[in-house]
Amino acid sequence: MVVGVVGAAGGVGASTLAALVARRLSRATSTALVDLDRGAAGLDVVVGVEDVDGARWPDLSGAGGDVRGADVVALLPRWGACAVLSADRTRPTAVDPGVRIDVLHALACEVGALVLDLDRGAVVDGDAPLAACDAVVVVARADLRSVAGALALRPRLDQAATRRGLVVRGGASAALGAADVAAASGLDLWHVARRDRALVARAERVGPGGRGPAARAADAVVRQLGIGT
């Protein structure tokens, strides 16, 4: 299974949710978490493995062609049982599209679950690997900015004809209700999460994620995927 996670707007916690979903899936099957967010500092920082040895995207620049998924997985740092393919904050560089396609295909053939932290701009531009995804999760706040962002994503999601769900973050004081966001964006509402102040306080550095609103959102997504927690 390949699962994409994308934010309807910046700062909604899409990378955090992607990481926690991957962590949960890794309890049931071999799992890799892949960083495709072009503007981020690296998922390895988010999950706290930035100092762990292993390959990042720049190390795979020559990996085009016939790539063996087992070889890639063996090179990657681990976050618990989950392999992590991240950008490198010290070596910011664009990934060659051909290399990205070959590496993702190899990983999808090797692991039981592949979780992609998608770049919102790449999705809108048609450069994200949506066709490879079995499901895409859109993360939004309960506000008009997220509605507009989700609507911008919809044409590409519709073209991919993949299953898609919506996770809405917000609280009782949110400008809109989660059902309003789902209705306006045309996406199925999978979960409503209250604002996680503890997560914000620790700068969205993700631990194993056993408790809290973000953890419950990840549990809800995994239930929707039907793999189990």
How does the language model describe each region?
Residues 27-28, 60, 141, 156-160, ...:
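Cytoplasmic membrane-interface segments at the C-terminal ends of transmembrane helices
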Residues 32, 98, 103-104, 108-202:
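Conserved catalytic-core segment of NTP-binding enzymes
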Residues 1-31:
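Walker A (P-loop) phosphate-binding motif
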Residues 2-4, 30-32, 82, 112-115:
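Residue-level preference for the first positions of well-ordered beta-strands
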Residues 201-223:
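C-terminal boundary of histidine-terminating zinc-finger modules
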Residues 7, 33-109, 199-203:
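P-loop/Walker-type NTP enzyme "switch/lid" segment
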Residues 49-53, 156-157, 182-185, 207-211:
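Short, hinge-like loop/turn segments at secondary-structure boundaries
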Residues 19-27, 45, 152-155, 183:
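Short, well-ordered alpha-helices that flank and scaffold nucleotide-derived cofactor binding pockets
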